[in-house]
């Protein structure tokens, strides 16, 4: 037959492919539809479809999709249903007969291999409108009959049969389709039928809720989702970013926000925050871009899904969400700045919770919260501090704290001044300690304010931009050992918040909060404590506690001495308070590990008084908050702790009891000797005697044995763990005598012996290395200092020995040896790092030196080493007499090196001298940064990087023993003019690193880098000579060392040491957050600890070394100098995140005895302290005590004796100097977990160092 049309068309190959594929798909779809209409799927049909799918190239997924299409096709379903009914009548072949359930097999066949993951409801600009429409439709549909009931007129049979399949289908689809409801059960509250409320409230929350409701499967739709909170949220337009942070009261401290957060669709973001929150004891607060979100955190306790009962809570949890760890939420609690930072850094580990201040700053800006109620837009919020203030009571929070009933939801205030946003919130749930309430003074925008929030276990401080510094005094209710629970009443929580540069909130009672871990030392019952913080812009956390009342139960143990406390008023005028000999200083407990306590005792007030004031024993209790349980299990290495004098023991016992009343209560009360389960190894009360007299008594109480304690539950919340610093500042003689003597006797035969033993500490944990002491070793300025120096040197020697030699095995002096061994066990012995004994001498500087202990381990180390050097002429050979200071500098370097070793993983603790020069530090800081980074990598600390010291120095570190001088040269390069320092540094490049650390953790304060401009800041970090025999190169004549000059920049404090100004002694000890992290690790595995101990020890050492001679005077107070202190922290890089804070706060302000103008430096110091602790979540131990062991793990307490002299800092905050206070730092932080994790790494490093090459300190000692 003729073809009438063309048989070949003008089709390309691609077109043909497409048409063919279409035909295949349509054919397969047609077959499926036909088979579906016939009835249920049978084996024959399956086989047929299997062959057909091969012929037509139909994939399994497409096959299933087609089946699902057919199953959900109501036409086909109706046909199959009708046909199946007729099957029973025998009208069709039996093979197709499937009965009423004609879709069961088809449904099974169409199931997805991988169920769809439920998705969060997307949020768009139209979400609110769409939700409103959807809600209207839902309401309308609710009045209509169920769809299954509408179709069948024959009804019963049809509806019955259809209904099951339909329901089944629906169920399947709902499970496969994203349903937020399941994930966010809490979010949906069937409070009312209408969902409209949320819309009016905070759009974000309501949107999320509504979207969740909309996404719910139809069968669930009858449940109305109503959010009460939306009404609260309405004020907040900024909520756009809102992430709901919900914390249920139950979540309390550790509970993950996550669990809470799942309630909301937004949860995913929140979850991260919740994690952080969980790390923190308190209900996590997410710092939201808007103030409101903070509020929500506080409201978390309500558990109401409304995230922001008080303000729009949604606010910007984004920040938090950005950091899964949600440091933010922690922050909300207490961690606030530091925590937030960490969150951004790493969500997963609480330890990272603490992060460098810089990070926080970076995050804060974005978080700037808007006043809970106001600014729609975050940006506005950022710009408008004031608005936020009004909405949150926080401005007045301080007063509020006492006034507010526990029930008060925490008010959160976020201020953003310099780019740091401070959120203060009060915690409402009882589980959250009342103390969590943090007051930030938003009043001044100029100076940064630290806001401290404490979660149960953690206390966090943030810098608030408020310029004004204020003192807050609160009375703390009498606290019983069970004080911990006091948290319910905000009043009970003692917070002090300082607005100036940094404000610290101290919530001793709250410490006890369940936060689980937090052990807070009890505060003297019935006494009023003044806590002031120096407004250091750069340091996020500093706590200064001054106890007005003479008595503090905790301090009972200390011998009664007259203590002079100086309070620096914002005005810069100083008030001196004398406390009766019996009086004890208040104990400050920081729930957050980051916080550092600075207890300053006026050194210069009177020479006569000084000696007594000099000693500030410190006890730190670390607890891990992240875990509900207290991680602080002491290894119980029985340790020299027993040796501690009775007084010390009493103190410890009291402290422990108080602390124990908190979660840790269980064992804490035991005696110190027992190693308080509290695991605060405090170097027992007499950490160091700074008495001028060359009093032998070493404040070192190595009670720290408990330090060794393992923290079983490290993982969760190293960071969260609160740190309590217990500082006992009492007359040097008594305190030194009781505790120190016991320890001394045990620990040191002679300073020298200690030095010898130092070499023992081959193992230096990187983390310990991370703690640079460099800064601390400021030259003692005045000749007067010599006598002090002597006393100190002995103490230092002890400390150094403890600290320096992690390996303790070699320590010559038996007692020391035991200590060292203990340390080895605890791994922290060295780190315990003695509290810096105060360098009592004439100038208040001595007290500052105590601060050395300050977290900035560098400083601590440096000071320590300096002390060693200063120790006395006693320190033999290595000593160098510093003409300016009149101190002998000796191998103080050793300790420094140890610190360095920790840091660098080289055994260069000795180098602790951290090139005193701030400039050097700063300059090197960048270089150091790299080094630190490497270190950090080891330590897993992110903060260090900035600090990396110059590599040159680092290289020298390795070469250290071989070429001390070259190192010095490097230092010189850095800008250090002083060779002597350089030599020390040179001896231990790591030391240099420490210095840089001293400079600051860059992260914490960007300004650190500024600091570098300062050329001559040296801390002469001479490691104590004894310790440093090797570094003996320590060499720098004290005279060479320049007086530290502290320049306090908003972010950084620069410390320059110049010999001339005796009064200024600044301990620049950046908190050694890194070290702390490691320490916790050490704590975790006591045995394992030996290596770990090295790290902890180093930290401790750095703490010890941190002391700065009182004589040293700061010439300039430059914010940039602060960086120095910060650097120290970075040096500690091991616990990098934490370190930042420490560093920032670290820099002790040098105060000039003579000039109030010195105020600036002290401020810096304080800041550093504050920053250090919270950031690190590190534990601060008393340097003295556990220097070697107890402190080991989180050591890094900064105890600073701040001269009574008013120190006018930029922030002009009040500094309270508490000569004889016990500060107990309990660190229950995730840090410990970190430490555990890092411990292994660090241990490896340490062991490598130990095994492979003796640390410079060791070598030095051996040489000696």
UniProtKB/Swiss-Prot annotation:
PANTHER family: BRCA2-INTERACTING TRANSCRIPTIONAL REPRESSOR EMSY (PTHR16500:SF3). InterPro entries: EMSY (IPR033482), ENT_dom (IPR005491), ENT_dom-like_sf (IPR036142). This is BRCA2-interacting transcriptional repressor EMSY. It is found in: Nucleus. Pfam families: ENT. Residues 145-179, 364-407, 660-700, 1232-1264 are annotated as: Disordered. One of its GO terms (biological process) is DNA repair. The modification Phosphoserine is found at residues 173, 177, 202, 782, 785, 1085. Residues 364-406, 681-698 have a biased composition (Low complexity). Glycans are attached at residues 192, 200, 235, 465, 470, 521, 1069. Regulator which is able to repress transcription, possibly via its interaction with a multiprotein chromatin remodeling complex that modifies the chromatin. Its interaction with BRCA2 suggests that it may play a central role in the DNA repair function of BRCA2. Mediates ligand-dependent transcriptional activation by nuclear hormone receptors. Residues 1233-1252 have a biased composition (Acidic residues). GO terms for cellular component: nucleoplasm. Residues 118-122 are annotated as: Interaction with ZMYND11. Residues 16-114 form the ENT domain. GO terms for molecular function: identical protein binding. The keyword Nucleus applies. The modification Phosphothreonine is found at residue 171.
């Amino acid at each position: 037959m003729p073809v009438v049309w063309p048989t070949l068309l003008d089709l390309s190959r691609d077109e043909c492919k497409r048409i063919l594929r279409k035909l295949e798909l349509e054919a397969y779809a047609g077959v499926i539809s036909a088979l579906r209409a016939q009835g249920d799927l049978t084996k024959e049909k399956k086989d047929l479809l299997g062959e057909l799918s091969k012929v037509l190239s139909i994939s399994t997924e497409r096959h299933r999709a087609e089946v699902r299409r057919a199953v959900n096709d109501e036409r086909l379903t109706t046909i199959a249903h009708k046909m199946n009914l007729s099957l029973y009548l025998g009208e069709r072949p039996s093979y197709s007969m499937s009965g009423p359930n004609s879709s069961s097999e088809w449904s099974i066949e169409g199931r997805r291999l991988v169920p769809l993951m439920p998705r969060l409801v997307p949020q768009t600009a139209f979400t609110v409108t769409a939700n409103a429409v959807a809600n209207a439709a839902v309401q309308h549909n609710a009045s209509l009959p169920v769809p299954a009931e509408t179709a069948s007129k024959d009804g019963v049979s049809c509806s019955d049969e259809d209904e099951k399949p339909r329901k089944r289908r629906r169920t399947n689809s709902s499970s496969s389709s994203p349903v937020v409801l399941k994930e966010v059960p809490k979010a949906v509250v069937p409070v009312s039928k209408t969902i409209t409320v949320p819309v009016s409230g905070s759009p974000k929350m309501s949107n999320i809720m509504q979207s969740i409701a909309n996404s719910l499967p139809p069968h669930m739709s009858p449940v109305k989702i109503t959010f009460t909170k939306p009404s609260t949220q309405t004020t907040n337009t900024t909520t756009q970013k809102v992430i709901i942070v919900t914390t249920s009261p139950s979540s309390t401290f550790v509970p993950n926000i996550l669990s809470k957060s799942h309630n909301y669709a937004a949860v995913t973001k929140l979850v991260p925050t919740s994690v952080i929150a969980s790390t923190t004891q308190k209900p996590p607060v997410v710092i939201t871009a808007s103030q409101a979100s903070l509020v929500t955190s506080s409201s978390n306790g309500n558990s109401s899904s409304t995230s922001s009962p008080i303000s729009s809570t949604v606010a910007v949890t984004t920040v938090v969400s950005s950091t899964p760890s949600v440091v933010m939420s922690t922050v909300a609690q207490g961690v606030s700045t530091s925590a937030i930072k960490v969150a951004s850094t790493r969500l997963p580990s609480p330890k990272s919770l603490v992060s460098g201040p810089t990070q926080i700053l970076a995050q804060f800006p974005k978080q700037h919260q808007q006043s809970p109620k106001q600014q729609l837009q975050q940006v506005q919020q950022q710009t408008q501090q004031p608005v936020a203030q009004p909405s949150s009571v926080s401005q007045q929070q301080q007063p509020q704290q006492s006034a507010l009933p526990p029930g008060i939801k925490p008010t959160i205030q976020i201020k953003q001044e310099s780019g740091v946003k401070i959120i203060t919130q009060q915690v409402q749930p009882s589980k959250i300690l009342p103390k969590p309430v943090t007051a930030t003074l938003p009043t001044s925008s100029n100076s940064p304010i630290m806001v401290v929030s404490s979660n149960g276990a953690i206390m966090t401080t943030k810098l608030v931009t408020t310029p004004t510094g204020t003192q807050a005094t609160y009375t703390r209710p009498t606290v019983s050992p069970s004080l911990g629970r006091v948290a319910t009443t905000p009043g009970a929580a003692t917070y002090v918040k300082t607005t100036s540069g940094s404000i610290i909130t101290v919530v001793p009672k709250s410490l006890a909060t369940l936060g689980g871990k937090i052990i807070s030392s009890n505060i003297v019952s019935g006494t009023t404590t003044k806590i002031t913080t120096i407004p250091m812009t750069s340091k996020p956390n500093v706590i200064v506690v001054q106890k007005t009342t003479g008595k503090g139960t905790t301090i009972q143990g200390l011998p009664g001495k007259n203590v002079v406390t100086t309070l620096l008023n914002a005005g810069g005028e100083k008030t001196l308070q004398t406390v009766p000999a019996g009086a004890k200083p208040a104990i400050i407990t920081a729930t957050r590990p980051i916080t550092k306590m600075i207890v300053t005792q006026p050194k210069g007030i009177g020479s006569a008084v000084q000696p007594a004031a000099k000693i500030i024993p410190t006890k730190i209790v670390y607890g891990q908050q992240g875990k509900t349980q207290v991680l602080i299990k002491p290894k119980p290495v029985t340790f020299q702790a027993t040796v501690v004098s009775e007084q010390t023991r009493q103190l410890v016992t009291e402290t422990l009891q108080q602390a124990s009343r908190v979660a840790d209560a269980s064992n804490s009360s035991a005696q110190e000797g027992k190693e308080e389960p509290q695991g605060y190894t405090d170097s027992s009360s007499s950490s160091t005697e700074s008495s001028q007299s060359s009093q032998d008594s070493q404040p070192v109480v190595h009670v720290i044995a408990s330090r060794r304690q393992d923290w079983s539950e490290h993982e969760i919340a190293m960071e969260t763990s609160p740190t309590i610093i217990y500082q006992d500042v009492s007359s040097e003689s008594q305190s030194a005598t009781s505790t120190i003597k016991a320890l001394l006797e045990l620990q040191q035969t002679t300073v020298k012996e200690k030095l010898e033993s130092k070499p023992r500490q081959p193992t230096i944990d990187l983390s310990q290395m991370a703690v640079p002491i460099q800064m601390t070793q400021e030259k003692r300025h005045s000749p007067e200092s010599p006598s002090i120096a002597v006393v100190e040197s002995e103490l230092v020697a002890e400390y150094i020995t403890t600290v320096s030699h992690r390996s303790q095995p070699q320590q010559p002096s038996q007692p020391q040896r035991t200590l060292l061994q203990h340390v080895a066990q605890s791994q922290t012995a060295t780190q315990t790092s003695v509290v810096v004994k105060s360098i009592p001498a004439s100038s208040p500087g001595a007290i500052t030196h105590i601060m050395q202990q300050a977290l900035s381990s560098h400083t601590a180390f440096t000071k320590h080493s300096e002390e060693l050097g200063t120790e006395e002429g006693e320190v033999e050979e290595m000593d160098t007499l510093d003409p300016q200071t009149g101190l002998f500098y000796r191998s103080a370097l050793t300790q420094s090196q140890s610190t360095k070793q920790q840091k660098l993983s080289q055994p260069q603790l000795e180098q602790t001298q951290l090139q005193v020069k701030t400039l050097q530090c700063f300059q090197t800081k960048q270089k150091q940064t790299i080094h630190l980074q490497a270190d950090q990598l080891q330590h897993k600390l992110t903060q260090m990087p900035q600090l990396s010291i110059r590599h040159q120095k680092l290289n020298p570190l390795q070469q250290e023993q071989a070429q001390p001088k070259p190192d010095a040269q490097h230092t010189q390069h850095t800008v250090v003019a002083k060779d002597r320092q350089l030599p020390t540094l040179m001896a231990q490049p790591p030391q240099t690193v420490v210095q840089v650390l001293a400079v600051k953790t860059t992260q914490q304060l960007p300004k650190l880098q500024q600091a570098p401009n300062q050329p001559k800041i040296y801390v002469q970090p001479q490691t104590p000579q004894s310790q440093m025999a090797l570094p003996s190169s320590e060499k720098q004549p004290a005279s060479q060392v320049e007086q530290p000059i502290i320049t306090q920049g908003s972010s950084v404090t620069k410390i320059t040491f110049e010999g001339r100004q005796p009064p200024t002694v600044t301990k620049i000890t950046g908190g050694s957050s890194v070290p702390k992290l490691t320490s916790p690790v050490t704590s975790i595995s006591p045995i394992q600890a030996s290596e770990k101990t090295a790290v902890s020890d180093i930290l401790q050492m750095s703490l010890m070394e941190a002391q700065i001679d009182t004589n040293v005077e700061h010439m300039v107070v430059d914010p940039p100098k602060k960086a120095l202190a910060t650097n120290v922290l970075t040096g500690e890089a091991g616990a990098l995140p934490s370190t930042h804070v420490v560093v920032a706060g670290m820099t002790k302000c040098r105060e000039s005895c003579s000039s109030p103008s010195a105020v600036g430096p002290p401020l810096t110091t304080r800041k550093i302290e504050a920053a250090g602790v919270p950031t690190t979540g590190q534990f601060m131990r008393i340097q003295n005590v556990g220097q070697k062991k107890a402190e080991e793990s989180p050591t890094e307490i900064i105890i600073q004796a701040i001269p009574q002299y008013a120190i006018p800092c930029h922030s002009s905050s009040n500094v309270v100097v508490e000569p004889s206070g016990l500060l107990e730092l309990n660190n229950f932080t995730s840090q410990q977990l970190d430490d555990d994790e890092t411990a292994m790494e660090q241990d490896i490093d340490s062991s490598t160092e130990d095994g492979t090459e003796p640390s410079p300190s060791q070598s030095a000692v051996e040489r000696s």
